[in-house]
């Protein structure tokens, strides 16, 4: 038997972590976001190095599944290394605002501007390094070019709706991870979420931007104005899904709860 924390307990843990994030210095925020960008770039690389050799033997579909689960390792790095993606700074910092003065909102603005920029800069740096000819195995460029072109082929409405769900998914992951002390549970949730994101090609602002950068570096005919435009489109959709669908609902759940403490669940 294992203890499942109540929504009130998860909210309290999130509030405490949110307060910490809202009071840390700028340097810590920036370095934490840079680390997260590296983690995601590592996951994108794993898509390529796993899928490329499998395509010939098992076909593109099976290779894509393997690559997606490889990408999930990037989310394991994210949780183990305590990096933070832009979308992980919805639920937790907003919980940390509870009972704080209005000027605390400036820290939220700082989080929501510094985090995505640092995430992407780290991913860009990694992409520039590893897309140098001969660094990654043969076929890696083809895989990542295909990934980028699939994203580019989507229409605006599809990209936005995909972004809404991506934001909700990552924010739900944040809630689950914050709610458990078990390292095994935290890593499993992170891995499955990352794989889900990659399998469905969801429009996560940081993940997709880094994937597009890799694709362009390998020769994908995708204009940079699409990358920039989708960045803002995805950010808006991620915020709508993460805050509107998950954060507000979970806060309401915690507030309306009876405070019954932990519940027992089968292991």
Feature-to-residue mapping (PLM):
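Alpha-helical transmembrane segments and their helix-helix packing motifs
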Residues: 1-267
